[in-house]
Amino acid sequence: MNLFNLDRFRFEKRNKIEEAPEATPQPSQPGPSSPISLSAEEENAEGEVSRAGTPDSDVTEKTEDSSVPETPENDRKASISYFKNQRGIQYIDLSSDSEDVVSPNCSSTVQEKKFNKDTVIIVSEPSEDEESQGLPTMATRNNNDITNLKNLSFFPNYSDNLSTVRQTRYSENLSSDLLKLIDSTSTMDGAIAAALLMFGDAEGGGPRKRKLSSSSEPFEEDEFNDDQSMKKKRLDHGEESNESAESSTNWEKQESIVLKLQKEFPNFDKEELREVLKEHEWMYTEALESLKVFAEDQDMQYASPSEFPNGKEVSSRSQNYPKNAAKTKLKQKCSMKPQNGFNKKRKKNVFNPKRVIEDSEYDSGSDVGSSLDEDYSSGEEVMEDGYKGKILHFLQDASIGELTLIPQCSQKKAQKITELRPFNSWEALFTKMSKTNGLSEDLIWHCKTLIQERDVVIKLMNKCEDISNKLTKQVTMLTGNGGGWNTEQPSILNQSLSLKPYQKVGLNWLALVHKHGLNGILADEMGLGKTIQAIAFLAYLYQEGNKGPHLIVVPASTIDNWLREVNLWCPTLKVLCYYGSQEERKQIRYNIHSRYEEYNVIVTTYNCAISSSDDRSLFRRLKLNYAIFDEGHMLKNMGSIRYQHLMTINANNRLLLTGTPVQNNLLELMSLLNFVMPHMFSSSTSEIRRMFSSKTKPADEQSIYEKERIAHAKQIIKPFILRRVKEEVLKQLPPKKDRIELCAMSEKQEQLYMNLFNRLKKSINNMEKNTEMCNVMMQLRKMANHPLLHRQYYTAEKLKEMSQLMLKEPTHCEANPDLIFEDMEVMTDFELHVLCKQYRHINNFQLDMDLILDSGKFRVLGCILSELKQKGDRVVLFSQFTMMLDILEVLLKHHQHRYLRLDGKTQISERIHLIDEFNTDMDIFVFLLSTKAGGLGINLTSANVVILHDIDCNPYNDKQAEDRCHRVGQTKEVLVIKLIGQGTIEESMLKINQQKLKLEQDMTTVDEGDEGSMPADIATLLKTSMGL
């Protein structure tokens, strides 16, 4: 019994004392040892009703001699539901889908409810006691001692002077062994815990800790679980007799779900499947996903029948595998709660919720259980000798950056650890860590957690390496045999169009991973035709007999392009567009459910797929064969709501298309892998998050461990990702040149920038939130681009005068001038300038053209545009800010340049027409685009110059924008010009972006020493096998 259950036990006893102080003592135990217990006869007469305040999962089998507090017979309820909170008890669930997101139940309980003094808070966190389904049954031999000892705990201040126990009237019922045990401890908590360990384990009735190497445990737990199952069946039968007709219908539905699940997993008992469904609130798809993960783990540990020449060896192995171990592991895998890995200090301060939440941040919190729990026993007080050496070696040799990976180890603590070196022995390490201010022995135990996490990642790497070797071996073998492997262009594709050689390699790679039951990421650089390769793959599946349905999820800006390309390349595929207003999507859903529509492929946008519960429900219930996600880097954050919702899409296979798989850090790449291969990676989510979440550093600052992490990531992603860059596959593609233009600010702009910088610098010390710091950065960026993005020229006096003049306008004659003034105060200079142009009475307040063009970047841009127009070049001009595009329109009109504009406000239906107009009308000189709206999936190869007026914090967004021109179909050399404000924050942004780009180079380049060796790259082998 851990202290959580002990506290709940006391609470129940205390309530029973208040409610039934005159209850009859149990005849089998005379005396005052159990003054609040019911008799055994009364207990048995009640039909095995569980004790009040205990959920069904905590009900245990009672022996004849056990004394259990119960609710009086008249007050007893017919059934106790697992999901109903008992009166006076608040359950707080610390489990959640993401480490960064607190469960809604938890937050509402903590923030909105005020607990009274009689309320017991039970923090619901998986523990070893949950495996034994509640409070353990004590051995009958020592049952009186333990019961008496627990009764003593209800005396006030019992723990202040434990010696007074001998003076109580209960001491006469205590055995000599128990009295000796009381003398050996200083608190009653310690006495009870020691008694449970001493007497409970002696008979096997104590708290059961899961031990992988135990030989006697399977039989004992098997018997316990079988009894538990029989009891649950009796309870279920009792509940059914009292339910209404509606409840009976619900029960029938639940039974049908159980039968449906049993068809998928015939080896599991119905009771086991019912428990899994209860854990997932009777959601069939979620329970199915969890069971698949469990089944996959079992397949990995025990060989399949195909590995043996006869079935006898397999059956003998399966017989040796204890039934209860499967049940235990099933419960661990399918419960959506984190399992404790290792925490030596868990017993200390166990009733502090803050400490529990704090500790849970470093527990293994993956969706389907932690792999640490499978490999290491939890909660052991003794440090194994094997880990002593590893910890000593790590703390002795690790760099400061590596030490900061230890949970709760800051940069300052890591610096202190390095100053304490050397650590010659385990005792010396313990002594130095304990006696140094700011450090504690906790760091040693947390270091073990880190080492375990690294072991998990290493196992995952080895697993991925095995898969990669199998794929390589098969392709090599097929290449040597010749023929039989090459997947030609599918015949149902448009015969007037043909795939390029590297696109055929991509199609063969997709077919290869599909045949091996894997999912993948097609990560070719932007402009290499990932869309065409995905369509060709769907055509290949169609010819193989897999006619769908498939789902394609795309950004809103590319949905028209996808529909066009599918109809052009493969008109055989019937496409259904799931897009439009809520009413339109409702009608489409009705047609899908009624099967009025015939389709092979559904095309929708990220927003339409998850925007409402009805949308999510459709794709959660609809059985899909393949789900393809275009611009897959939108799934780089595994903690986002979008990520969690899209994970629920019911598809057998997943394929991600992205031109930028690595953006800010390695964790984003791991998030993509977890999305496409959840069965393999979701059990190690927390370990992956911690091992790959550190920030990137410049090459000269990278430690050996940093480089090892990059090598580890490359090894993990190797079987699941295909990445080609243009320089490798398109020798005929014209080159792309980059040019940085440092733009000196105008005199007035520089003065305004420095004033803003100094003002923000003074207030920055008072800012604690990151959001406020981001706002500072944004204000500086806006001033570096153009002064009119702030309010400088329209002073408060001018605004008051303008607000009075606005009353003369027919639309504002009855308005309040104070409210008009407030609205004007939050507007920028350019917005106020546009307002003055709209209303006649404030026309005189318009800004002069000199002020509008007074920007350092505008001076440089004007000269560049004039030169390019003379050469006959065409320009695509990007900006992060739509208001900056408004000001750029004034510049282009002033210089009389023809232009088109596309941003986030442009209707989806109009975008494809604007793109076609620019590509066909060569007299249009400039295409204005916002980076976010126009940087994805748009083909603008008719232009050969890309100008980035202001760069993005994420350099891959800029790369996406650049490749609107530098892609298949481009015939001219592409020039990319980046305008950087000299002496501004943009110079620092440029340096950081270059560091992020370096990470991609590290991930995609070939390691030194690999050249000249046998080609191991799958793409290279496929190319060789196809004779390309």
From Swiss-Prot:
One GO term of the biological process aspect: positive regulation of transcription by RNA polymerase II
Cellular compartment(s): Nucleus; Chromosome
Crosslink site: Glycyl lysine isopeptide (Lys-Gly) (interchain with G-Cter in SUMO2): 77, 84, 337, 473, 726, 998
GO molecular-function terms, A-Z: ATP binding; ATP hydrolysis activity; ATP-dependent chromatin remodeler activity; chromatin binding; DNA binding; helicase activity; nucleosome array spacer activity; ubiquitin binding
Residues spanned by motif Nuclear localization signal: 723-740
CUE domain sequence ranges: 158-200, 253-296
Keyword Mitochondrion: no
Domain Helicase C-terminal: 860-1012
Positions occupied by motif DEGH box: 630-633
Motif segment (DEAD box): 1007-1010
Any single GO CC term annotated in Swiss-Prot or TrEMBL for this entry: site of double-strand break
N-acetylmethionine PTM positions: 1
Binding sites annotated in the UniProt record for ATP: 523-531, 899-906
EC number: 3.6.4.12
Entry keywords, A to Z: Acetylation, ATP-binding, Chromatin regulator, Chromosome, DNA damage, DNA repair, DNA-binding, Helicase, Hydrolase, Isopeptide bond, Nucleotide-binding, Nucleus, Phosphoprotein, Repeat, Ubl conjugation
Catalytic function, reaction form: ATP + H2O = ADP + phosphate + H(+)
PROSITE patterns to which the protein is assigned, alphabetical: CUE, HELICASE_ATP_BIND_1, HELICASE_CTER
Keyword Electron transport among record annotations: no
Region (Disordered): 13-81, 204-253, 303-348
InterPro entries: CUE (IPR003892), Helicase_ATP-bd (IPR014001), Helicase_C-like (IPR001650), P-loop_NTPase (IPR027417), SNF2-like_sf (IPR038718), SNF2/RAD54-like_C (IPR049730), SNF2_N (IPR000330)
Similarity comment: Belongs to the SNF2/RAD54 helicase family.
Function of the molecule: DNA helicase that possesses intrinsic ATP-dependent nucleosome-remodeling activity and is both required for DNA repair and heterochromatin organization. Promotes DNA end resection of double-strand breaks (DSBs) following DNA damage: probably acts by weakening histone DNA interactions in nucleosomes flanking DSBs. Required for the restoration of heterochromatin organization after replication. Acts at replication sites to facilitate the maintenance of heterochromatin by directing H3 and H4 histones deacetylation, H3 'Lys-9' trimethylation (H3K9me3) and restoration of silencing.
Subunit composition and interactions: Binds to DNA preferentially in the vicinity of transcriptional start sites. Interacts with MSH2 and TRIM28. Part of a complex composed of TRIM28, HDAC1, HDAC2 and EHMT2. Interacts with PCNA.
Protein name in UniProt: SWI/SNF-related matrix-associated actin-dependent regulator of chromatin subfamily A containing DEAD/H box 1
Native source species: Bos taurus (Bovine)
